[in-house]
Amino acid sequence: MALKPLQDRVLVRRVESEEKTAGGLIIPESAKEKPSEGEVVSCGDGARKDSGELIEMTVKTGDRILFGKWSGTEVTLDGEELLMMKESDILGIIT
Protein backbone atom coordinates (compact mmCIF):
# COMPACT_ATOMS: atom_id res chain seq x y z
CA MET A 1 0.00 0.00 0.00
CA ALA A 2 1.28 3.49 -0.82
CA LEU A 3 0.65 6.63 1.21
CA LYS A 4 1.08 10.13 -0.25
CA PRO A 5 1.36 12.83 2.43
CA LEU A 6 -0.73 15.96 1.92
CA GLN A 7 0.46 19.58 1.92
CA ASP A 8 3.73 20.08 3.86
CA ARG A 9 3.78 16.65 5.51
CA VAL A 10 6.59 14.12 5.19
CA LEU A 11 6.60 10.33 5.68
CA VAL A 12 9.83 9.22 7.42
CA ARG A 13 11.47 5.85 8.10
CA ARG A 14 13.57 5.92 11.28
CA VAL A 15 17.25 5.02 10.87
CA GLU A 16 18.25 2.68 13.68
CA SER A 17 21.10 3.68 15.95
CA GLU A 18 24.24 1.66 16.53
CA GLU A 19 23.91 -1.45 18.69
CA LYS A 20 27.43 -1.02 20.10
CA THR A 21 29.23 1.91 21.68
CA ALA A 22 32.58 3.14 20.40
CA GLY A 23 34.18 1.12 23.21
CA GLY A 24 32.48 -2.09 22.05
CA LEU A 25 29.70 -2.31 24.67
CA ILE A 26 26.40 -3.71 23.39
CA ILE A 27 23.43 -1.47 24.16
CA PRO A 28 20.29 -3.42 25.21
CA GLU A 29 16.94 -2.55 23.57
CA SER A 30 15.57 -1.26 26.89
CA ALA A 31 18.34 1.37 27.12
CA LYS A 32 18.07 2.64 23.55
CA GLU A 33 16.35 5.90 22.74
CA LYS A 34 14.16 6.18 19.68
CA PRO A 35 16.32 7.45 16.84
CA SER A 36 15.89 11.08 15.82
CA GLU A 37 17.38 10.44 12.41
CA GLY A 38 15.47 9.14 9.41
CA GLU A 39 15.05 8.82 5.68
CA VAL A 40 12.28 10.61 3.80
CA VAL A 41 10.02 7.99 2.20
CA SER A 42 7.47 10.35 0.64
CA CYS A 43 6.61 14.09 0.61
CA GLY A 44 3.53 16.17 0.06
CA ASP A 45 3.45 18.92 -2.58
CA GLY A 46 4.06 21.73 -0.07
CA ALA A 47 2.10 24.30 1.91
CA ARG A 48 0.12 27.14 0.36
CA LYS A 49 0.27 30.85 1.10
CA ASP A 50 -2.96 32.75 1.76
CA SER A 51 -2.80 33.86 -1.90
CA GLY A 52 -2.90 30.19 -2.96
CA GLU A 53 0.71 30.17 -4.17
CA LEU A 54 2.51 26.87 -3.52
CA ILE A 55 5.53 26.89 -1.19
CA GLU A 56 7.70 24.02 -2.46
CA MET A 57 9.14 21.45 -0.07
CA THR A 58 12.79 21.78 0.96
CA VAL A 59 13.23 18.03 1.54
CA LYS A 60 12.76 15.31 -1.06
CA THR A 61 12.35 11.54 -1.09
CA GLY A 62 15.60 9.82 -0.10
CA ASP A 63 16.95 12.71 2.01
CA ARG A 64 18.45 11.73 5.36
CA ILE A 65 17.08 14.06 8.04
CA LEU A 66 17.34 14.95 11.71
CA PHE A 67 14.14 15.62 13.67
CA GLY A 68 13.06 16.34 17.25
CA LYS A 69 12.59 13.55 19.77
CA TRP A 70 8.81 14.01 19.98
CA SER A 71 8.20 14.92 16.32
CA GLY A 72 5.56 13.30 14.17
CA THR A 73 2.80 10.75 14.50
CA GLU A 74 3.58 7.05 14.33
CA VAL A 75 1.94 5.27 11.40
CA THR A 76 2.10 1.54 10.62
CA LEU A 77 2.06 0.79 6.90
CA ASP A 78 2.39 -2.78 5.61
CA GLY A 79 3.80 -3.83 9.00
CA GLU A 80 6.49 -1.12 8.98
CA GLU A 81 6.50 1.66 11.59
CA LEU A 82 6.91 5.10 10.00
CA LEU A 83 6.50 8.70 11.14
CA MET A 84 4.28 11.34 9.56
CA MET A 85 5.45 14.87 10.37
CA LYS A 86 5.28 18.43 9.09
CA GLU A 87 8.30 19.75 7.26
CA SER A 88 8.72 22.34 10.04
CA ASP A 89 9.42 19.45 12.50
CA ILE A 90 12.58 18.61 10.55
CA LEU A 91 15.69 20.18 12.09
CA GLY A 92 18.03 19.62 9.15
CA ILE A 93 19.15 17.53 6.19
CA ILE A 94 22.21 15.33 6.75
CA THR A 95 24.63 15.67 3.83
Curated annotation (Swiss-Prot):
The keyword Cytoplasm applies. GO terms for cellular component: cytoplasm. Keywords: Chaperone, Cytoplasm. GO terms for molecular function: ATP binding; metal ion binding; protein folding chaperone; protein-folding chaperone binding; unfolded protein binding. InterPro entries: Chaperonin_GroES, Chaperonin_GroES_sf, Chaprnonin_Cpn10_CS, GroES-like_sf. Pfam families: Cpn10. It is found in: Cytoplasm. GO terms for biological process: chaperone cofactor-dependent protein refolding. CDD domains: cpn10. It comes from the Bacteria. Heptamer of 7 subunits arranged in a ring. Interacts with the chaperonin GroEL. Belongs to the GroES chaperonin family. Together with the chaperonin GroEL, plays an essential role in assisting protein folding. The GroEL-GroES system forms a nano-cage that allows encapsulation of the non-native substrate proteins and provides a physical environment optimized to promote and accelerate protein folding. GroES binds to the apical surface of the GroEL ring, thereby capping the opening of the GroEL channel. This is Co-chaperonin GroES.
